[in-house]
Amino acid sequence: MKRKNFTEVSEFIFLGFSSFGKHQITLFVVFLTVYILTLVANIIIVTIICIDHHLHTPMYFFLSMLASSETVYTLVIVPRMLLSLIFHNQPISLAGCATQMFFFVILATNNCFLLTAMGYDRYVAICRPLRYTVIMSKGLCAQLVCGSFGIGLTMAVLHVTAMFNLPFCGTVVDHFFCDIYPVMKLSCIDTTINEIINYGVSSFVIFVPIGLIFISYVLVISSILQIASAEGRKKTFATCVSHLTVVIVHCGCASIAYLKPKSESSIEKDLVLSVTYTIITPLLNPVVYSLRNKEVKDALCRVVGRNIS
């Protein structure tokens, strides 16, 4: 069968929040504020964990890795979005779009599997406390972090290779960054294979972590219920609630965004979901999981007190 000739597309333009009209300046101020808070909070967490030896444990090692990943994650998406809110119709090259999607997929996948590693850490700490330091060795922690990044890299190569081998007819991306489905819609040809790849990858990235975390917490809850002291049960359970909150928000938004049927898709809902998992969730992590943590707050007080004195 003879291949059709397609006009070569060299750049895209984001439609973004153009439908919000006069509210775009308000959105810019809100998103900029959240962006700055996210960067500051995550940088504070990474810095405190690095310089305070009391926090040199597997749990806080994973926290620092998640905070670092979330920082880069926001840097990949938000600055370009803020630029588009002020200067409309700012183009992005095909290579720039591919690069943004590549790092977005790496970091989003990495975050999911880091949360899984943190769930395993909680399982070992609560269910196998006497062997915790032996099991959660530096070597295993490094392997879990490298494994998370490696899975993210593999998924990104799969996605970007499949996506940018497509011929594109349209140039206007009905979104605020190079997300998978909005870019796929611009293709001139049938994208069934790409949709199958996306569904398979998304299912793996979402359901494998959820499944492993679920198993971990079934075992954790059974151990918590065996604790004799009510105060002990409450304290142990509190350490798990923050992690579960982040997992539910992160994986919940991702599953709705990437696994919902086409018939249920709408531009407004997709924008709200995307804002949640690209802008709100990276701020939620440090607030819920770290800055409310007593050990982190104590470490912050020690660092501030040391600098003042």
From Swiss-Prot:
* Cellular component terms per the entry's GO annotation: plasma membrane
Q: How would you summarize where this protein is expressed among tissues?
A: Expressed in both the aorta, the coronary artery and umbilical vein endothelial cells (HUVECs) (at protein level).
What organism does the UniProt record list as the source?
Homo sapiens (Human)
What Gene3D superfamilies does the database record attribute to this sequence?
Rhodopsin 7-helix transmembrane proteins (1.20.1070.10)
Entries under CDD domains matching the protein? 7tmA_OR10A-like
Which PANTHER family does this one have?
OLFACTORY RECEPTOR
The record ties this protein, via InterPro entries, to: GPCR_Rhodpsn, GPCR_Rhodpsn_7TM, Olfact_rcpt
What is the protein's major site of localization?
Answer: membrane
Which segments does the topology annotation call Extracellular?
1-25, 76-99, 161-196, 258-270
* Record's keyword annotation contains Iron-sulfur: no
- Name under which the protein is recorded: Olfactory receptor 10J5
Q: Is Coiled coil set as a keyword in this record? A: no
Membrane-spanning parts: 26-46, 55-75, 100-120, 140-160, 197-216, 237-257, 271-291
Q: Which terms under GO biological process does the entry name? A: angiogenesis; chemotaxis; detection of chemical stimulus involved in sensory perception of smell; G protein-coupled receptor signaling pathway, coupled to cyclic nucleotide second messenger; lipid homeostasis; muscle organ development; regulation of angiogenesis; regulation of muscle cell differentiation
Q: How does it sit in the membrane?
A: Multi-pass membrane protein
Q: Which family does it belong to?
A: Belongs to the G-protein coupled receptor 1 family.
Q: Which UniProt keywords apply?
A: Angiogenesis, Cell membrane, Disulfide bond, G-protein coupled receptor, Glycoprotein, Membrane, Myogenesis, Olfaction, Receptor, Sensory transduction, Transducer, Transmembrane, Transmembrane helix
